[in-house]
């Protein structure tokens, strides 16, 4: 449920936009002089026969410093409050990005398979002001972990959450945090790390924008800041991992190259941790750009989680 969209404005002030909400993918709308009308309803036939999970806003306090953290909980279709459901923590990438009250096929697919899904905006997320976003400047990952764990702590107080069946996944920056999480806690039954950075030292030297990453995300080049790079790298904590962990990355991903996933996978195998590495042929960093890849990704993640349910 990332932010984003497309618009076009004419010289006379008329505009066209992509328009959607948490229960509808984007359609086309036009507007002028304070009025807007929707032109398309591309998924009406589908939604006449498919029921979506309800999406509810959640606020909670971070255990680190008491900051308010914003999130959303997606419930399975036909949710029954008298039952208990497994919970997936789904973490956004970026890390300077945000989730919101927007449609996500991936999240709804998780919910359709009987999972609660929590997605949040930990520190570093955009849309909450400059100060909040910059809390992770040269400090990522770190206290964003506390923000995420506080969300889990908040939700497991609800009687419909099965606290014995907790799972975690995320892609790109969310993959970084997922790998970080399993190096810091064993509370999750299983994890899926998608297209992550695992070793900041190697990443800044061969990813697709080397002139950017070491200047803005790090305090300088790695050979001058070895301790900092390794302290913030999930590979440093791979020896702590006991959580069954799947990794998946596109073979044509130049943003978070395959070798990042391979490093973590090898570390897990050397420590006899149950693990799997999925290489997605032809896929770039945008795995879901091909719809069949999105469906396969969700099926792989839920199959992994189903395997480790209690």
Task: Please report, for each region that a protein language model flagged, where it lies by residue.
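Conserved beta-propeller blade repeats
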Residues: 1-18, 48-51, 56-57, 100, ...
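Beta-strand C-termini and the immediately following turn/loop, strongest in propeller blades
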Residues: 16-22, 32, 62
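Cap/lid segment of the alpha/beta-hydrolase catalytic domain
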Residues: 34, 42-164, 171, 203-213
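Beta-propeller blade-edge and WD-like acidic-aromatic loop motif
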Residues: 23-39
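Glycine/Thr-rich phosphate-binding loops of Rossmann-like dinucleotide-binding domains
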Residues: 25-26, 98-99, 201, 256
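Short flexible coil/turn linkers enriched for glycine and charged/polar residues
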Residues: 21-22, 65-67, 175
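Active-site-proximal cap/loop segments of hydrolase catalytic domains
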Residues: 119-310
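Conserved hydrophobic/aromatic positions in well-ordered beta-strands
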Residues: 29, 72-74, 278
